[in-house]
């Protein structure tokens, strides 16, 4: 026997087994079809950031449905880099130049708790908000949820503004590229999350504001149940008037004129010209659609696509889709806060040298209201004026627009932009849905939130504004104060709520000591009220 040869074989075998064992035992190394990636140890959790799920949406792939990422990694992929924002004209960037991000941005980031008691975790997939125009995956934090250690979190980046939503309403330039990005990311999660210790059968899709509306739109695909077990829309749903808008074709050609494509006569030539322009030029042109400040806040947003559009997300009015029953029949929850409209109204209290912005409404209400409240493309000029006068009289009466009447104006914004459409969505789901439909209203003002930032003032009590609940789950830069003791309890309750919802076998939902009541088949709305020191189930004929 050749003992030298046998010994060499044994040594090499041990080296091979040892190297593979170390890869297996190293939680920072993850094997994917593309190759291996290395994450970061953050003490209480592991992170794997900026993982591409789609080919870069640049060049010929701009204004196209995303293509799955195909590249193989010859070296270990570095998954320790903070995800870049998708290219945008950002409302919250100070100064005149608000251009932020990169066109090549389609990544997911995975965050996994350290928990020796579990071999696998349910998964919460997160779609960030930002009116479909701005925002980034990194802007919503993960320290709170990782501290609790209940689920794996996956943050999704998707195309925004004109790069994500410009549309001519035909198959040449159908739009909704950002929504198609989200859907491809969900497929990536389904196929790959087990490699990180996630449970692909227990995925909950969540989002806030435009993220919440995105969740609802994704759910309206009949096969959504193949991608997620449940869905949660915080302060945003498919029926909000700022979500699916009309007039997209006109804005697409206006964008073309603004960037030197004025000779384009049809969708094909417009698309070709827009593809030839620098991405930064297209996104910077957003400012030409704003009549003042960042109004309207969503000039480019989801549209109804033609039925022959490639990989169409939605081709019918969401109301008709829900009535048909042909949508993802999974448990769904929706929410609003008592002054959600503070996000949209607060900038009107910003002070200038010439006075407060709200003063302008006294002379320009008929001009500005259709942009502020998103009915400029749905009514004739006469009907717009009549409606503007009607809602002013209903909410403001004969008062002037000023700081004294601001609370009534904020209530108008809350009702029209959030609450009324939340009620309508829930009403449709309770009548035509087969899976549980839940709702909550939150009333517990934060010491600092989005309204104080936009108004640049702390001397006004805005109430419970857009994000005051959600930012207790996923931290946000607009809230730079410590949580109060009551908010710490609420934060834990929210996080436990999501963890349980992600893995619930029967679709039940619970917050703290309160079980949500299902709205499907109920004559009255079942609404869970969440406030500073508890929760309570309430029944309503109409939302309070």
Swiss-Prot record:
Domain of life: Eukaryota
The keyword NAD appears for this protein: no
Tissue note: Specifically expressed in the ejaculatory bulbs of male.
Keyword match Transferase: no
Entry annotation: catalytic residues: 209 (acyl-ester intermediate), 466 (charge relay system)
Localization per record: Secreted
Gene Ontology BP terms: courtship behavior; mating; ovulation; pheromone biosynthetic process; regulation of egg-laying behavior; regulation of female receptivity, post-mating; response to odorant; sexual reproduction
Phenotype for residue 268 to A: In strain: 174F, 178.7, 357F, 517S, 709.6, Bar-F-7F, Bar-F-77F, Bar-F-79F, Bar-F-93F, Bar-F-96S, Bar-S-24F, Bar-S-60F, Bar-S-78F, Bar-S-89F, Bar-S-99F, Bar-S-95F, DPF-13, DPF-30, DPF-46, DPF-77, DPF-82.1, EM-10, F-96S, F-274F, F-517F, F-531F, S-549S, F-611F, F-775F, F-1461S, MA-4.2, S-114S, S-2588S, VC-815, Ven-S-1F, Ven-S-2F, Ven-S-3F, Ven-S-4F, Ven-S-11F, Ven-S-21F, Zim-F-H27, Zim-F-H31, Zim-F-S11, Zim-F-S18, Zim-F-S53, Zim-S-S34 and Zim-S-44F
Enzyme Commission (EC) number: 3.1.1.1
Pfam families xref list: COesterase (PF00135)
The entry's keywords: Disulfide bond, Glycoprotein, Hydrolase, Secreted, Serine esterase, Signal
Signal peptide, first to last residue: 1-21
Disulfides per UniProt: 86-105, 261-273, 514-535
Function: Transferred from the ejaculatory bulbs of males to the female genitals upon copulation, plays an important role in the reproductive biology.
Full protein name: Esterase-6
Organism: Drosophila melanogaster (Fruit fly)
Gene that this sequence comes from: Est-6
